Regions:
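Conserved short alpha-helical segments that host acidic/polar catalytic motifs at enzyme active sites
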Residues: 1-188
Length: 188
């Protein structure tokens, strides 16, 4: 069980993400992380092992990370030990796709083996990194939109999950998908 939060708007995203994660901390306290797109369109990722307090300290309560679009995650480890490396968000090899995930990807080992054969490297022992790189694979292979790439990946992923992703080439957008797992989206 994990907690996912996202924000797109006019305010600085990091403090809002951290506030949202604090409300979801009961869903996971092994590690936490955020990804925020800065004004130069680069996506900055900050992660911390342990409770959310560590991430809050690392980001100066969000005031050291600038941008108005981001995703955050608080983790309860299912695949891979609690560590900063296994903390979400995870990225594609080139950093174009960034994602967080809640749930279980049952066939992640099989998908990972196929991605390794296609030149992908893995740094964590999580199923989430596999999902992010699978989406990246379809995004690059077929030159589809993020929605098409996510749809191609979802057809191949077995399990119950919810995903939130950002693409460096699509600023101020967050893409979400779910299968048999809850996802609530609010608009204010």
């Amino acid at each position: 069980m994990c907690g996912i939060v996202g924000y797109v708007g006019k305010e600085q995203a990091a403090p809002i993400l951290l506030d949202g994660l604090s409300k979801l901390e009961y869903r996971g306290y092994d590690s936490a992380g955020i990804a925020v797109r800065d004004n130069a369109s680069a996506i900055k990722i900050v992660k911390a092992k342990g409770r959310l307090k560590g991430l809050i300290e690392k980001t100066d309560a969000g005031h050291a990370v600038f941008g108005t679009c981001g995703i955050g995650h608080t983790r309860w480890a299912t695949h891979g030990e609690p560590s900063e490396t296994n903390a979400h968000p995870h990225t594609s090899d080139d950093g174009n796709v960034v994602g967080v995930h809640n749930g279980i990807i049952e066939n992640y080992q099989e998908l990972k083996a196929k991605l390794v054969k296609n030149g992908y490297s893995f740094y964590s022992s999580t199923d989430t990194e596999v999902a992010v790189k699978l989406v990246d694979y379809y995004y690059k292979k077929y030159e589809h939109t993020p929605v098409d790439a996510i749809n191609h990946a979802m057809v191949r992923i077995r399990g119950s999950y919810a995903l939130a992703m950002m693409f460096e080439e699509y600023p101020n957008e967050i893409y979400v998908a779910r299968k048999d797992s809850p996802m609530i989206i609010g608009i204010a």
